[in-house]
From Swiss-Prot:
It comes from Wolinella succinogenes (strain ATCC 29543 / DSM 1740 / CCUG 13145 / JCM 31913 / LMG 7466 / NCTC 11488 / FDC 602W) (Vibrio succinogenes). This is Orotidine 5'-phosphate decarboxylase. Substrate binds at residues 8, 30, 59-68, 118, 178, 187, 207-208. GO terms for cellular component: cytosol. The active site is at residue 61.
Amino acid sequence: MQLCIALDLPSQEENLKLLESLVGLPVWIKVGLRSYIRDGKEFLGRIRQIDPRFELFLDLKLHDIPNTMGDAAEEIASLGVGMFTLHASSGGEAMREVAARLARFPRRPLAFAVTALTSFGEEGFREIYNASLESKALDMAMLAAQNGMDGVVCSVFESQRIKSYVAQDFLTLTPGIRPFGEPSGDQKRVADLHEAKSASSDFIVVGRPVYKHPRPREAVEKILEGIA
């Protein structure tokens, strides 16, 4: 299991200060919409300057027509990031196009398809998809696997079911991790480290429990110890 730290602080300066406290730790750094829109691709270079060993995860959750998604995937791959996200609900054709574009790169990023955001509960999910969250997440995961994606973004509670349904080596990336029993906030489907390990999550994402901790490095070290 690998750890991704979400950079969700209000300013670039605060995010960089957080990163400076984590130098030398074996973590992925997740750059989401807020940071990328505000700070641009130059921000990725600043992260690398702080510690070139940080692995970069660009979490933009692409969702568009196939050609546009393919173009975006090529641009993302050219940035040299290690992984990125798109929505499985963009469809099989769009995911096939992304996979085909990525195949042009000798060293390409991992592509993860989002099934159901962890902010969804069952009721909210049904309002949009008119289906149960678990069954639809399984179907989306299979669609993603059949169309060239490396894995899916899902909650811990779907992770092992998806692996059993698709393949044990199909990757799962699970947000909504509350390692020290923190409040769930705007997330509906949250889990602790033990649950993530039991569900065979390949990557976990932790944000607020790290950057709101008075000693972020200590928090990350404890998480790394817990998933070792």
